């Protein structure tokens, strides 16, 4: 459904227009009060050739999350430490998120998990950095259950202490594949619905990877969400489960900014909680993404499956941001289906639109930052990766 007044596409729950507009008003009242979390996490699933567009090769994908976080915080800067990996097409969605976060005057909180290095910029310390990335999901042993529970409990505590609404975003190369594995572990047949940062989703490759992981995991009939994340998930999922539950226990609204990775979080939470009325929990939870990710309806279909399976009414919102008239190929590539989403681009740009900023303003600032990135050599050349 499309809201002409707001330029926003609604998907998922077919609630009436009045209810949708009421929900939007909730967000509009709190725009400048949101706390944005960017969870940057490592999984060795990202090292599989052809699995992700978040970097042109396996080596560059190890740096992607750090470079995204740095750019989200600082934008184009001569003092950058991490070069943004060269992509086959497009440019990091951190560009969009940085521009829009500055417009609405929100300073994101970075949560590094499983990266193996300590970022030089301000960040939230949740676990020992020496733990490193989770294993490739094909092993069926991504992480120890102890690590999963620790990450969940840390997220839960942070969420429960929240005094303001939160937005959860991510930069997890390989994360759509772990998301698919988690959903399929719970019986959802989603191989043809889970999206990708790549122009053409590597569905056959992902199907083989997920099947191998689930076979090796050998999950029994009495498994729970922790078991699934430990088997085929990633650190982002464990932490974000807790963060979402904690924030809702604190009666805060939550925007899950992304696509299939955020739906995997919802699924894990709904499987984990013994709720008498799931709708009370979901009431002020929103999935927010970019218009590019919902173009082919796959994400909407995926959301419908979850709404039906768990008898909830989760609402999806798609940002109206577009680069149709941009003068730069890297931005126009988004219109062709490249990159699509990441680093909270959908949710953060949605908040900027709800705060009254126009598409032309956002595009202009994205172009200015892109120009500076090029001048400052902030995008790596392939030979540097």
Curated annotation (Swiss-Prot):
PANTHER family found in the cross-reference section: PTHR38811, UPF0284 PROTEIN SLL1500
Family as reported in the entry's similarity comment: Belongs to the UPF0284 family.
Organism name: Prochlorococcus marinus (strain MIT 9215)
Annotated Pfam families: DBI_PRT
UniProt GO MF annotations: nicotinate-nucleotide-dimethylbenzimidazole phosphoribosyltransferase activity
Annotated TM spans: none
Protein name: UPF0284 protein P9215_05181
InterPro entries given in the database record: Nict_dMeBzImd_PRibTrfase (IPR003200), Nict_dMeBzImd_PRibTrfase_arc (IPR002805), Nict_dMeBzImd_PRibTrfase_sf (IPR036087)
Top-level taxon in the UniProt lineage: Bacteria
């Amino acid at each position: 459904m499309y809201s002409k007044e707001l330029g926003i596409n609604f998907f998922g729950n077919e609630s009436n227009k009045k209810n949708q507009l009421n929900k939007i008003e909730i967000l509009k009242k709190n725009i400048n009060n949101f706390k944005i979390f960017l969870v940057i996490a490592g999984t060795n699933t990202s090292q599989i050739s052809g699995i992700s567009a978040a970097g042109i090769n396996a080596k560059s994908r190890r740096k992607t999350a750090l470079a995204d976080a740095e750019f989200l915080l600082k934008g184009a800067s001569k003092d950058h430490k991490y070069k943004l990996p060269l992509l086959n097409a497009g440019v990091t969605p951190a560009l969009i998120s940085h521009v829009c976060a500055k417009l609405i005057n929100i300073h994101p909180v970075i949560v590094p998990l499983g990266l193996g290095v300590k970022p030089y910029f301000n960040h939230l310390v949740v676990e020992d950095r020496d733990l490193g990335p989770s294993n490739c999901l094909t092993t069926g042993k991504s992480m120890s259950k102890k690590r999963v529970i620790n990450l969940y409990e840390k997220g839960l505590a942070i969420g429960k202490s929240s005094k303001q609404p939160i937005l959860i975003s991510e930069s997890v190369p390989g994360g759509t594949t772990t998301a698919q594995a988690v959903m399929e572990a719970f019986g959802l047949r989603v191989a043809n619905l889970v999206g990708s940062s790549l122009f053409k989703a590597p569905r056959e490759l992902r199907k083989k990877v997920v099947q191998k992981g689930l076979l090796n995991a050998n999950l029994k009939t009495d498994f729970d969400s922790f078991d699934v994340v430990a088997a085929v998930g990633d650190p982002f999922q464990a932490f974000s489960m807790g963060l979402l539950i904690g924030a809702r226990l604190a009666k805060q609204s939550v925007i899950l900014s992304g696509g299939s990775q955020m739906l995997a979080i919802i699924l894990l939470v709904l499987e984990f909680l013994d709720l008498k009325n799931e709708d009370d929990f979901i009431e002020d939870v929103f999935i927010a993404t970019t218009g590019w990710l919902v173009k082919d309806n796959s994400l909407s279909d995926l959301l419908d499956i979850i709404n039906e399976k768990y008898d909830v009414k989760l609402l999806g919102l798609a940002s109206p941001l577009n680069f149709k008239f941009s003068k730069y190929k890297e931005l126009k590539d988004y219109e062709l289906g490249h990159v699509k989403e990441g680093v909270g681009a959908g949710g953060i740009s949605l908040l900027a639109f709800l705060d009254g900023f126009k598409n032309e303003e956002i595009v202009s600032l994205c172009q200015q930052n892109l120009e500076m990135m090029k001048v400052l050599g902030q995008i790596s050349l392939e030979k540097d990766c």
